[in-house]
């Protein structure tokens, strides 16, 4: 018996998350671990992750199977949020209209700026000496 599933990819900074959304009871697994364990029981990360589902009232209707790579925990959380919103949009276009005003479908393109030669960091210059 095959169940219906919706997949999408989200990215943030160096993090990438593949999100698989299946009808179920609201179980979240990240890299084959429970979501609470993976995100260290941090309620801020878990509420950010569930944001698109909470906006539509679907938090207990779907199971999430997530593969997250790269970056840190915060970047992965935001990548999952974007991937989840995109997966929900593949279900139906009217759900897209309700997610868009909340900003769940917007990719946060900010990333670390590269270091330039002659500088200590991306923009920090060595101390200036007049004489």
From Swiss-Prot:
A Pfam family of this chain: Ribosomal_S9
Keywords: Chloroplast, Plastid, Ribonucleoprotein, Ribosomal protein
GO molecular function: RNA binding; structural constituent of ribosome
Localization: Plastid, Chloroplast
Record-linked Gene3D superfamilies: 3.30.230.10
Keyword Hydrolase: no
Organism: Emiliania huxleyi (Coccolithophore)
GO biological process: translation
InterPro entries, alphabetized: Ribosomal_Su5_D2-typ_SF (IPR020568), Ribosomal_uS9 (IPR000754), Ribosomal_uS9_bac/plastid (IPR023035), Ribosomal_uS9_CS (IPR020574), Ribsml_uS5_D2-typ_fold_subgr (IPR014721)
KW Acetylation (keyword) present: no
Lineage: Eukaryota, Haptista, Haptophyta, Prymnesiophyceae, Isochrysidales
Homology family: Belongs to the universal ribosomal protein uS9 family.
Any one Gene Ontology cellular component term annotated for this protein: cytosolic small ribosomal subunit
Protein name per its UniProtKB record: Small ribosomal subunit protein uS9c
Disulfide cysteine pairs (residue numbers): none
């Amino acid at each position: 018996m095959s169940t219906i599933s919706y997949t999408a990819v989200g990215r943030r900074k160096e993090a990438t998350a593949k999100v698989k959304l299946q009808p179920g009871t609201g179980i979240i697994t990240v890299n084959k671990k429970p979501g609470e364990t993976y995100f260290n029981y941090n309620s801020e990360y878990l509420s950010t992750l569930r944001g698109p589902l909470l906006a539509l009232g679907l938090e207990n209707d779907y199971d999430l199977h997530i593969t997250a790579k790269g970056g840190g925990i915060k970047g992965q959380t935001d990548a999952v949020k974007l991937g989840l919103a995109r997966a929900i949009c593949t279900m139906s276009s009217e759900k897209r209209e309700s997610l868009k005003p909340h900003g769940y479908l917007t990719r946060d393109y900010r990333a670390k700026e590269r270091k330039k030669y002659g500088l200590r960091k991306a923009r920090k210059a060595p101390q200036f000496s007049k004489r």
